[in-house]
Amino acid sequence: MEEGFVPVAKVADVPPGTMTFVAVERERIVLAHVEGGFYALRDVCGHRNAPLSRGRLDGCIVECPLHFAQFDIRTGKYVDGPYSADVPIYEVRVEGDTVYLKR
């Protein structure tokens, strides 16, 4: 794997249509398996710092569990709700049965 990528999960641990929390060093990240790919974004809604990994995933939209702000898990772009800023995303790669995240 390229330099800068760290292993964060096994492919089998994140079934299609689901998301999970992962930590890389001190960074909280939500990892999702949607539309045949893996996507990662910062696991914090900027509105009240709620963990997005505890929210609801509907297709490619993750919803904050606190005030229901919605973000596209693939791009981090704000979709709807009380908080209108985007969430940072991370580059993800899959090699074999392992999911890697770029730090």
Model-derived features with residue positions:
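Short cysteine/histidine-rich metal-coordination sites, predominantly Zn2+-binding motifs
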Residues: 59-65, 78-87
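N-terminal pre-ligand scaffold of iron-sulfur
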Residues: 1-59, 73, 86-103
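Short cysteine clusters
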Residues: 45, 64-67
